[in-house]
């Protein structure tokens, strides 16, 4: 399968949104940058924080959009368009209401499932939904009317520790993801639970 050239971490900008459930994807990309020893730098051209590193001679770019979640596609389309990165060479990390905290799953393609960040990325990529997703479980409040406050809220410590563990599990399968070994990455990641 295709190797990844761009990893996007979704979230909302600003200190008031740091450590909220909705910023799980951004946290994942921050952890990659930390592990790689690189700084993410604000780049107005790409509407986000960007970084770059090499893995076994392969150039991999990181992006955390600094637009609000529902405009994430603006950043993804700008960077992917400039560097000629195809949708299937993109991994988007995002919070997932349909998975419990401590669970992370990889998925290729599909709809947006009501996630406004994914919805905008699909639209901005010309209705291309073939990009890969890292779904980081945050759980569900149980009632649809509570979702907005839930995702924009900070998780209790025990829940945050589970999210951190799922991010660690996902970091552990990155070498397989970089190599395009999706089946192996999925098998290893999907067998983990915090």
Curated annotation (Swiss-Prot):
It catalyses: an N-acyl-L-alpha-aminoacyl-tRNA + H2O = an N-acyl-L-amino acid + a tRNA + H(+). GO terms for biological process: protein quality control for misfolded or incompletely synthesized proteins; rescue of stalled ribosome. The keyword Cytoplasm applies. InterPro entries: Pept_tRNA_hydro, Pept_tRNA_hydro_CS, Pept_tRNA_hydro_sf. NCBIfam families: pth. Monomer. This is Peptidyl-tRNA hydrolase. The gene is pth.
